[in-house]
């Protein structure tokens, strides 16, 4: 299983850029295999992300902002959920990883 991080490479928001970087750095530091999916380059990727976020997890207004995190095609959560799981030391549960995560080749 591969963690998929949906991000925006050309975001003008400093906050979004920092949040994306924090998620990727955590995955890299913990050798958790992941794939970056840039939603700014392909409309179909953005639409797939929007469609696969459960309705009860969508923001009250507007579109979901990156980063959005999936385990293959299963939605894990957004940055706030990731941050909460990191603070409570439950990231593997958040990412729905049961065993030692696959190591990314360096």
UniProtKB/Swiss-Prot annotation:
One of its GO terms (molecular function) is SH3 domain binding. Keywords: Nucleus, SH3-binding. Belongs to the SH3BGR family. A motif (SH3-binding) lies at residues 61-67. It is found in: Nucleus. This is SH3 domain-binding glutamic acid-rich-like protein 2-B. It comes from the Eukaryota. Gene3D superfamilies: Glutaredoxin. InterPro entries: Glut_rich_SH3-bd, SH3BGR, Thioredoxin-like_sf. CDD domains: GRX_SH3BGR. Signal peptide: none annotated. It comes from Xenopus laevis. GO terms for cellular component: cytoplasm; nucleus. It holds the Pfam family SH3BGR.
């Amino acid at each position: 299983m591969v963690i998929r991080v949906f991000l925006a490479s050309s975001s003008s928001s400093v906050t979004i850029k920092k949040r994306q970087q924090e998620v990727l750095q955590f995955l890299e530091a913990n050798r958790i295999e992941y794939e970056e999916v840039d939603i700014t380059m392909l409309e179909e990727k953005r639409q797939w992300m929007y469609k696969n976020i459960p309705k009860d997890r969508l923001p009250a207004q507007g579109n979901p902002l990156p980063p959005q995190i999936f385990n293959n095609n299963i939605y894990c959560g957004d940055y706030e959920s990731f941050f909460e799981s990191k603070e409570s030391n439950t990231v593997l549960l958040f990412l729905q990883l049961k065993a030692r995560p696959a190591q990314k080749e360096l």
